[in-house]
């Protein structure tokens, strides 16, 4: 008899554990039922579809705390948690619109949810990752130049513009274009342009090239002034880089392009880019997406030898400022007129975690390390209009002169190197129905910095005489930005009320280089300067 009672108890317990159900409805944000929506218990494969009234039921659910997600074409997927008891559970979904008639929904230029390009009050363009990848270009700035109307990027070979490309939109400077990442303001570069077109002189824009192309899920471009919403730095428009957020999958991409050989035999350089994107789950309710890229873009030049170069001079000294003139590539000329060398590593992370039904924590950012190099104008021995020699001892003419020709008998071509480091981090929390008042909120903090280190080699400072170095640390530039944001949105049917507050701090730092790069040396006393070639005193 005891065995029979025990058997009946086990059967009843089994029925209690595995015969529970979840029921509810799936509707859109306006309360209309969604027929045929998929409702699934996360991680189990159990699921159901909603009927014409939007109702659904999932049976055989294990009691306890579980997560359920609902999805429907053209709407955002929603994931909710519920405690399943002996009596089952009820769970109701309200899905926001994410696409209408195949159109993408945009978040740039509006604070209202579900806004498509057709409904946007301003012209906006959208480019998905497939459009960007088909360019086959490792440089994101170059990719955007080829895709975005009225966006221009000019390659320059002077000063820091060789390392941070000058951009413009609608004919306005680069710092009139606001660059966002996941709708958050991106920091500006450390370079204040003073080379190139007059339009960009004094401009300080963001360096878009620090973001790997493989990390971008979608690009939104607002080609109109948006200063009322974003501030005065959005006069020319807004570019919003939406990062990938998939929680699974691995993608590798390698591109290689070879430049054609010129009639003078120069050419054949290869541009190589290797990139990867990895999506990983962050527990059962989040994601971590990581992207990385390494690119090699060599210096390009198709010019022949400089007409004023001395016989036998092949360019710059790759042995870092010594007299070994044979230690150069055979194709080097005294000056290069083409694209500077630019190599770099770039990485991005994007993470999100559903903390509760209506609250999500998020974090994203980037780290990049780049290197570039290009040549200045040729300093030709004996043909310079500048001071070429100084007396070693102004009180003893028999001591002779010191000339830069003693170090560089065939002349020299200075080389400028730029080492850029870029870092940004954004952390925040967003949710819906704050305090039960129906207010959507987004609290975030961000930090971004761009550091540009300059190094000059194959040169000298004549005022330091024979003690002059040949290579110089000439100084660094740094831009730092810190932001604290609180955004609130209160949807009221067709009316949308948005308000918020922001605290922002910006720092610009200039670090001096080594003293020989900027300080006059002991031979700089004006009345002792003498140009032996011109036969004149400078004093």
Question: Across the structure, where does each feature detected by a protein language model lie?
Answer:
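Short, acidic, small-residue-rich periplasmic hinge/interaction motif at the N-terminus
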Residues: 27-29, 37-42, 69-75, 85-133, ...
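Short, polar/charged loop or turn motifs at beta-strand boundaries
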Residues: 120-145, 165-172, 203-209, 256-264, ...
């Amino acid at each position: 008899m005891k065995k029979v009672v025990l058997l009946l108890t086990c059967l009843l317990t089994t029925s209690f554990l595995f015969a529970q159900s979840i029921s509810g409805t799936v509707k859109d944000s306006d309360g209309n039922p969604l027929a045929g929506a998929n409702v699934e218990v996360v991680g189990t494969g159990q699921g159901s579809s909603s009927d014409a009234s939007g109702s659904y039921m999932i049976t055989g659910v294990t009691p306890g705390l579980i997560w359920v997600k609902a999805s429907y074409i053209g709407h955002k997927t929603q994931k909710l948690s519920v405690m399943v008891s002996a009596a089952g559970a009820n769970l109701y979904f309200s899905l926001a619109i994410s696409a209408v008639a195949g159109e993408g929904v945009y978040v740039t230029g509006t604070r209202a949810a579900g806004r498509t390009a057709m409904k946007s009050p301003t012209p906006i363009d959208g480019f998905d990752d497939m459009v960007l990848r088909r360019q086959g270009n490792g440089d994101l700035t170059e990719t955007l130049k080829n895709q975005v109307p009225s966006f221009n990027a000019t390659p320059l070979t002077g000063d820091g513009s060789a390392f941070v490309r000058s951009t413009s939109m609608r004919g306005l400077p680069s710092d009139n274009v606001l660059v966002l990442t996941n709708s958050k303001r991106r920091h500006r570069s450390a370079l204040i342009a003073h080379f190139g077109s007059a339009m960009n002189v004094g401009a300080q824009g963001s360096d878009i090239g620090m973001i790997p192309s493989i990390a971008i899920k979608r690009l939104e471009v607002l080609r109109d002034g948006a200063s009322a919403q974003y501030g005065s730095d959005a006069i020319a428009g807004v570019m919003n880089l939406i990062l990938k957020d998939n929680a699974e999958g691995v993608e590798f991409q390698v591109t290689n392009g070879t430049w054609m050989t010129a009639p003078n035999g120069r050419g054949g350089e290869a541009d190589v880019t290797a990139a990867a994107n990895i999506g990983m789950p962050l527990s059962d309710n989040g994601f971590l997406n990581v992207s990385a890229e390494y690119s090699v873009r060599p210096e390009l030049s198709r010019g022949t030898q400089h007409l004023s170069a001395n016989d036998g001079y092949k360019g710059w000294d790759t042995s870092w400022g010594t007299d070994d003139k044979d230690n150069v590539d055979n194709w080097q000329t005294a000056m290069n007129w083409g694209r500077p060398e630019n190599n770099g590593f770039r990485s991005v992370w994007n993470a999100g975690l559903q903390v509760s039904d209506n609250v999500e924590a998020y974090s994203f950012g980037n780290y990049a390390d780049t290197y570039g190099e290009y040549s200045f104008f040729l300093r030709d021995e004996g043909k310079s209009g500048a001071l070429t020699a100084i007396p070693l001892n102004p009180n003893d003419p028999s001591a002779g002169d010191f000339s830069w020709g003693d170090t560089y008998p065939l002349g020299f071509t200075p080389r400028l190197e730029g080492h850029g480091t870029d870092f940004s981090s954004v952390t925040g929390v967003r949710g819906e129905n704050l305090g039960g008042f129906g207010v959507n909120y987004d609290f975030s903090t961000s930090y971004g910095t761009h550091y540009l280190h300059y190094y000059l080699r194959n040169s000298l400072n004549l005022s330091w005489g024979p003690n002059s170095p040949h290579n110089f640390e000439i100084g660094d530039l740094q831009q730092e930005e810190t932001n604290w944001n609180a955004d609130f949105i209160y949807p009221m049917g067709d009316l949308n009320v948005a308000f918020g507050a922001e605290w922002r701090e910006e720092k610009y730092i200039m670090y001096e280089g080594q003293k020989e790069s900027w300080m006059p040396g002991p031979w700089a006393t004006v009345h002792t300067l003498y140009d032996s070639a011109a036969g004149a005193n400078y004093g």
